[in-house]
Amino acid sequence: HMMIYANRRHSYKDLPIRIGEIAHDFRYESSGTLKGIERGRHFCQNDAHLFVTPEQIEDEFSKVVDLIFSTYKDFGITDYRCVLSLRDPENKVKYHDDDEMWNTAEDALRKVLNDLGIEYTEEIGEAAFYGPKLDVNVKPAVGNEYTLSTCQLDFCLPAKFQLTYIDKDGEKKTPVVLHRAILGSLDRFMAYILEETKGNLPTWLAPVQVKVMPVKTDNEELMAYAHKVVDALDAKNVRVELDDRAEKLGYRMREGQVEKVPYLLVLGFNEVENNTVSYRLHGQALSLIHI
């Protein structure tokens, strides 16, 4: 992303510039730390870098924080801990050597969190080498706390890559970069969601939202009605599957429950006659609706 930014000239009027992607990352983690999709050597990350002027830091960081928590609201995540990771002033050899930069960066992040009324803890010595960061940590049902989301403030790398923009006075200035990962590693994020929901994903997130099950799969009338229902749902962008296997209905229903499909639709002759479907919401009894 640094090289993409450096590929052309930029004015202060262009900033902020936001460059993001879903990236495949590789990291040689020690074998003892590997843990399924929660921590692997290959993972996917929703990675973004935001190029801003110093005056835009607080506003852009505030937008990142809002995006993190609006995303958590969508997924029903309420149990998390915000950590402002700072450098250790007693061990400066670990960090980019610029006291003024560090003080400015840490004060900017701290001010935004205070202005937004967000509770957080400060952890000395946990910053990246190039700047302070906000980590949002969760505690899974099993195992240690880990970071889901992060936003890191970076004054260092833009200078090393010789990135510039032209300010309002026509002078070359170095932008500031915010490293942003809203969901962090997608693999780890899904591991957390699956663990928290025990696989009972909300309907909007379930890979298959509805399974349609005719009582008899060898009856033309029932199968025609089943295809009609599937087509109607598919037209509404519902992720629907037709289970037309030559198995007993009870067996297919049990499999649908084990797969944790949110809605199982059962179609019999009464449903065909009355233009209705019987449905079972995962974990509940059958109900009837008209279509």
Task: Give, region by region, the residue ranges found by the protein language model.
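NTP/phosphate- and nucleic-acid-binding module
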Residues: H1-L288
